[in-house]
Amino acid sequence: MSDTTILQNSTHVIKPKKSVALSGVPAGNTALCTVGKSGNDLHYRGYDILDLAEHCEFEEVAHLLIHGKLPTRDELAAYKTKLKALRGLPANVRTVLEALPAASHPMDVMRTGVSALGCTLPEKEGHTVSGARDIADKLLASLSSILLYW
């Protein structure tokens, strides 16, 4: 495709418009990721996502995002064991999933499953950072179970 396009049945020439509205403007500060520091790149906690995608397992990247660092071999094994133990779904969540139409979109199923999980296992008021990480681990472990059960 060229930089200019002629509309069918028209003499008008249009040019693609580059979106520059927020180009170079920080949208927020986070320790989790940086976007576009050196072009069209994305880094998670300082690691280039292309390197992570090529060299890491899913659980390693999840550990990096949730717990702040890449795990050692022993930490990774323990983390996988923890996630496996958290995969179970409460009966109330299974009942909600059973009521969903078979033609539902998987994203809608996950959203509904997470909502049911939140109602069944509500967060405590004023939980700690460690408690927030436990919640994230439970959600991470539950998403595949939600889809597979449905």
Question: PLM ranges: what are they?
Answer:
Residues 2-150:
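Hydrophobic alpha-helical bundle cores within soluble ligand-binding/oligomerization subdomains
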